[in-house]
Amino acid sequence: MWITQLLGIRSGPPLGSHAWILIAIFQLAMDFIICESESPGKAYKHLQRPSLVRRVHKVALWSPTELLKLRNQKQFWNPINNEHPVLPIERKHYKTYHENLFFSRNVPLKYSTMKNSHYSSQQIKHTVKTTNLNRSKRQLQSRSWDNLKRFLDSGSQPTTVSEFILWGPTGDDDVESSTFPGIYETTRTSTVHARTTLLETTTTTTASTTTNVKVTTLQNPGIHNGKKSPGRISTTDPNPGNGKTARPPRIPNDTSGLAVHQIITITVSLIMVIAALITTLVLKNCCAQSGNARRNSHQRKINQQEESCQNLTDFTPASVPSNMDIFTAYNETLHCSHECIRTPVPVYTDEALHQTGAFKTTFNGNRPTSSDRHLIPVAFVSEKWFEISC
């Protein structure tokens, strides 16, 4: 009833026209019941199956790996195929196996995942690893034998193998005391056995033997060819000079010593400095001597002036008589010792005395006689005049 009410169906004649709606609802309900009764894995596969047709154009059809992936996807999504599906782990193993297939040829093809094998990935990896280790050991043995055989065939010319470095003393000691004792074990084997080993491993060491290491021949005087070790290789440098200390090699661009022009420049500079010092001392002594001479001459001249003019102020009362005139007394006593005053004596005449009236008014003393008029009036002249004249 609730379905008919929901759909708006009324009771009556129109009921026959809506019968197909009821049938569709019933079919939908049955589909839900069937889906719930089935397992969830199968239902999920039915509902979530991707469309492979749309992704085919993205896959490179000429690549075998892409074709194999597409085939595995088809097998995984096939609901009819009830066999064991190829899991992602097996696909990862397939990738690892094919990557290692280029380096190892001893792994049989029965381990391929194309036949749905039951081998685990760990077992396959272990097998591949073991095969690679065996192959590397065989390559090392064959390569060491080739190098040592070439060294033994060289005879007197010593060779230095760049692949091996042997450290230790350079005497005739045992070969087994070296760092690599296993290398010389191959030399004790016979040549026939070594050649058979090479013939057995030609399929695995073809690429490695074609690219052999180059052997450089060097004339090294430090190698000793002993009886126990005919192929002794020495990497130590010999001691040159028979015990004498060798002089280190000189660097081409080494300028540790002084050049000739530098020595000349330093010498000239020292000579100029010494000459400047000597010149300074000589000039200083000359200036000191000239200063002393000038000072002494000046002092001597001052002393002479003082001695010559000392009598000008030396007036004694006994030298002037009481009954004589002052002009006469001064005229007799005032004179210089070196006779520096020899000036013409002015003559005072009557005309010269009567020219001005001021002189007559100021001079009221007794006029001297005509015989005494040639005297110099010393009383009216300062003492400085005599110093200047002297």
From Swiss-Prot:
The chain crosses the membrane at residues 263-283. It is a single-pass type I membrane protein. One of its GO terms (cellular component) is basolateral plasma membrane. Keywords: Cell adhesion, Cell junction, Cell membrane, Membrane, Signal, Transmembrane, Transmembrane helix. Residues 283-390 are annotated as: Targeting signals. Residues 38-262 are extracellular. It is found in: Basolateral cell membrane; Apical cell membrane; Cell junction, Adherens junction. Residues 218-253 are annotated as: Disordered. Residues 284-390 are cytoplasmic. Pfam families: AJAP1_PANP_C. Residues 1-37 form the signal peptide. InterPro entries: AJAP1 (IPR039239), AJAP1_PANP_C (IPR029198). One of its GO terms (biological process) is cell adhesion. Its main location: membrane. It comes from the Eukaryota. May play a role in cell adhesion and cell migration. This is Adherens junction-associated protein 1.
